[in-house]
């Protein structure tokens, strides 16, 4: 995110699915790059400003499944807004449930995995020399999920 070539707004929007699940170490990276973070809580806040935002929006995780919209009806509006956001090619990152929501919005199947993945491993960042998130390369991150998804077409 070189300031001479970056035209993104200097605020990152993040959609939470639990109030205590935030950006963690990633927030420090954005802070070091001069970005502020504004959080929106799914099911509580109006997500339209985050989903319509021209800058980077990060969709975070949570202990729910994409396929649980009957129990979590806010997912339907979030998915609808996410489909439009992706159609408009707005910068979007999905972490955990967020990645599942993006896959679903792009037409991929999201489903319960054969077994849960729980544990720590090192994050591997691709194209480290040109990646604004390269500061995270090699850090230990927690994996804790039971759902998985097929890659969307052309991903």
Regions found by a protein language model. Give the residues of each.
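Short N-terminal binding/cap micro-motifs at the start of the first secondary-structure element
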Residues: 20-25
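Cofactor-binding loop segments of dinucleotide-utilizing enzymes, especially the Rossmann-like FAD-
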Residues: 15-17, 42, 97
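Catalytic nucleophile loop
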Residues: 85-109
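Glycine-rich His-Gly loop
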Residues: 15-18, 59-63, 146
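Extreme N-terminal starter segment of soluble prokaryotic enzymes
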Residues: 7-13
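Pocket-forming structural segment of enzyme catalytic cores
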Residues: 106-155
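Flexible gly/pro-rich beta->alpha loop and the following alpha-helix that scaffold active-site loops
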Residues: 28-93
């Amino acid at each position: 995110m070189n300031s001479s070539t970056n035209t993104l707004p200097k605020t990152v929007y993040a959609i939470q699915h639990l109030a205590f699940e935030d950006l963690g170490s990633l927030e420090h990276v954005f802070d070091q790059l001069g970005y502020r973070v504004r959080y929106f809580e799914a099911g509580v806040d109006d997500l339209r400003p985050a989903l319509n935002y021209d800058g980077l929006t990060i969709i975070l995780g949570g202990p729910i499944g994409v396929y649980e919209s009957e129990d979590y009806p806010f997912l339907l509006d979030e998915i609808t807004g996410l489909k439009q956001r992706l159609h408009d090619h707005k910068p979007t990152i999905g972490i955990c449930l967020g990645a599942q929501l993006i896959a679903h919005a792009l037409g991929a199947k999201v489903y319960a995995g054969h077994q849960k993945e729980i544990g720590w491993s090192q994050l591997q960042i691709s194209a480290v020399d040109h990646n604004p998130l390269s500061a995270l390369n090699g850090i230990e991150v927690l994996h804790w999920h039971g759902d998985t998804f097929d890659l969307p077409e052309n991903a």
